[in-house]
């Protein structure tokens, strides 16, 4: 039995001038999602999706490469200005933001939406090195 040929879906070009970038930077990886104002995903990328493995995913350079890739995908849809929402304690926060500026986006606002507990769950134990 022959396999059916899988169809490649081509992304239709959406004309969206402004959007929101969600930068989720953890200790292990950096995920970047660009959405429209309603929250529908336009483009996404992560350090792991760019081929970085293991401890290299958590580096600022990996976050920069992921942000540049995501920005190019969003520019194909006609996006020019961005609001930035940064979440998490990771090392790729600032480098991802700088990469978005270097690609040529106009950044209108930067918000830190990292959740801070009002003495909620017990934190994990301290590392002793």
Swiss-Prot record:
Residue ranges of the TM segments: none
Source superkingdom: Bacteria
InterPro entries referenced in this protein's UniProt entry, alphabetically: Ribosomal_uS11 (IPR001971), Ribosomal_uS11_bac-type (IPR019981), Ribosomal_uS11_CS (IPR018102), Ribosomal_uS11_sf (IPR036967)
Keyword Transport listed: no
One Pfam short name: Ribosomal_S11
PROSITE patterns in the record: RIBOSOMAL_S11 (PS00054)
A biological process term (GO) from this entry: translation
GO cellular component, as recorded: ribonucleoprotein complex; ribosome
Keywords, ordered alphabetically: Ribonucleoprotein, Ribosomal protein, RNA-binding, rRNA-binding
A molecular-function term among this protein's GO annotations: rRNA binding
PANTHER family: 40S RIBOSOMAL PROTEIN S14/30S RIBOSOMAL PROTEIN S11 (PTHR11759)
Task performed by this protein: Located on the platform of the 30S subunit, it bridges several disparate RNA helices of the 16S rRNA. Forms part of the Shine-Dalgarno cleft in the 70S ribosome.
Complexes and interactors: Part of the 30S ribosomal subunit. Interacts with proteins S7 and S18. Binds to IF-3.
Family: Belongs to the universal ribosomal protein uS11 family.
Name of the protein this chain belongs to: Small ribosomal subunit protein uS11
Species the sequence originates in: Bartonella henselae (strain ATCC 49882 / DSM 28221 / CCUG 30454 / Houston 1)
């Amino acid at each position: 039995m022959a396999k059916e040929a899988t169809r490649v879906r081509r992304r239709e070009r959406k004309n969206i001038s402004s959007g929101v970038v969600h930068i989720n930077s953890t200790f292990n990886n950096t995920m970047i999602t660009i959405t429209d104002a309603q929250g529908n995903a336009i483009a996404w990328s992560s350090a792991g999706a760019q081929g970085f493995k293991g401890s290299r995913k958590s580096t600022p350079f990996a976050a920069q490469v992921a942000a540049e890739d995501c920005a190019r995908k969003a520019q194909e849809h006609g996006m020019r200005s961005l609001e930035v929402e940064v979440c998490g304690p990771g090392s790729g926060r600032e480098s991802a933001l700088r990469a978005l500026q270097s690609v040529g986006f106009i950044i209108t606002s930067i918000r830190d939406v990292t959740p801070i507990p009002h003495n909620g769950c017990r934190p994990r134990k301290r590392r002793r090195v």
